[in-house]
């Protein structure tokens, strides 16, 4: 079964790059432009992992993550926060994996594979 990833980023060109890299690696990827849209579509999409921008207008990535972790069915869902801020600060505040921007294709795919396995694996 192909692993599903939800990309949440308000910058269209960054979303497109992330989707391209993940799709090329064999993952089934859906992208949305806001945390609110991600919350609305989460149950239907049932992702195996979320790649989440920290800095977005409206509800930011950290607020989204807090809501996600408050829901029992999503507490264990792997999340990678992407940020231009201090990685240590973001990781400490949110207790999850953080990928600093700009990031390389190798860094993205290595972290995704570490968390959920290869695109067609049953997990890590």
Task: Cite the ranges covered by each PLM segment.
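The C-terminal output helix
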Residues: 113-124
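Short amphipathic alpha-helix used as the core "switch/output" element in two-component signaling
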Residues: 40, 62-75
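C-terminal output helix
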Residues: 103-115
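Two-component/phosphorelay signaling modules centered on CheY-like receiver
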Residues: 12-30
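Helix N-cap/capping motif at the beta->alpha junctions
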Residues: 31-40, 61
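Active-site beta3 strand of CheY-like receiver
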Residues: 45-51
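Active-site residues of response regulator receiver
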Residues: 53, 83
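Receiver (REC) domain active-site loop signature in two-component systems and cognate sites
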Residues: 56
